[in-house]
Amino acid sequence: MNKTAIALLALLASSASLAATPWQKITQPVPGSAQSIGSFSNGCIVGADTLPIQSEHYQVMRTDQRRYFGHPDLVMFIQRLSSQVSNLGMGTVLIGDMGMPAGGRFNGGHASHQTGLDVDIFLQLPKTRWTSAQLLRPQALDLVSRDGKHVVSTLWKPEIFSLIKLAAQDKDVTRIFVNPAIKQQLCLDAGTDRDWLRKVRPWFQHRAHMHVRLRCPADSLECEDQPLPPPGDGCGAELQSWFAPPKPGTTKPEKKTPPPLPPSCQALLDEHVI
């Protein structure tokens, strides 16, 4: 399947319905020991933690949408990364969407973020903390040129390279999704220390933020991990294929019905949603 078709499928999956999903009716984490269940794009979470809104090292955006819940491992990762960034004097980490209180499907914007192991982080590190108004209506900084072939040189900063590298070097991180042009710039800037680049994967959009994904926790027995990324730094032919023009004859894929929920997630919905 070519990349245009994949992009259309991802769009359909992330915005299949603008109506509220049953998961949005669950307003508090489900009590219990933390368990990520199912896959990143078809799952849920029991025992989610709430990311503390107040921190000297990070700020949480769009708190009115209440998407600041996740597995305790995700909360600890955010605290760990933002502390590293702060100690290096790089600025304040801006946290976007994590997941809903019980995970599950969004009504739009995300196909994944369902098991409490995904977080979006802006690719800007303000030296001055944002106001409440800025956090509620954040202005994304598009780092990619209009033609999508490279980053905007005046906007690309060494601190952003370091932010992505620090995240990729974290032991719990398995993937970081960024725009292909951003991946390309990372490849150019990386020098000889390149092992971490394997985790950084090119993906559609992601022009102003990175999407960080953690591995399944060892004690979440119903959590489904993705296969590891292909060996190597991912800076060769695979990356260049993202810049090739779409093949002629691309057709819009049919809208697909979401797959059945994992039984444990369906049972959770049955118990907690009237």
UniProtKB/Swiss-Prot annotation:
Top-rank taxon: Bacteria
Annotated segments matching region Disordered: 228-265
Molecular functions per Gene Ontology: metal ion binding; metalloendopeptidase activity; serine-type endopeptidase activity
Main location: periplasm
TM region positions: none
Top EC category: hydrolase
Disulfides per UniProt: 44-265, 187-235, 216-223
Binding, Zn(2+) 2: 147, 150
Signal peptide (residue range): 1-19
Cofactors, names only: Zn(2+)
UniProt name for this protein: Penicillin-insensitive murein endopeptidase
Phylogenetic placement of the source organism: Bacteria, Pseudomonadati, Pseudomonadota, Gammaproteobacteria, Enterobacterales
